Amino acid sequence: MLDTTQVFRSRLLADDVQRRILYYPRTLAAATYVREHIGEPIRLETAAALAGMTSCAFSRYFAEKVGITFSTLVKTLRIEHALSFLEERDGAISALAAQTGYQSCCTFSRAFKDVMGQSPSEYRRRMLFQR
């Protein structure tokens, strides 16, 4: 299990979002679940149950308290997890997609571009060029 003080040292999430996640026990429980199961299917229902709420109520609560949706949190943390693989390892993008919980390379690439503004292969090339 992750130390809760370490859960949200994220380079992609804004500092105020990280503070809000840590401040509310329900959002922290859900966010910890995401971090601990990043390579697996993440279900809103499971996060809501950990927070002691229904899915609908939790979804509203999370967005209201944190300032982003739960699905945005999941996508952002998955992409952040992928960054270290792209920066440190060679390997197929399809394998990386599976390791970060995406069912297809296409879905992963779309999410990556949405968060990072470039494709995973473009990001990797840029990192190699900067070395």
Predicted regions and their residues:
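DNA major-groove recognition helices of helix-turn-helix
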Residues: 30, 65, 82
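Short, basic, alpha-helical segments at the C-terminal edge of helix-turn-helix-like DNA-binding modules
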Residues: 74-84, 122-131
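Intrinsic structural disorder/low-complexity segments
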Residues: 16, 29, 127-129
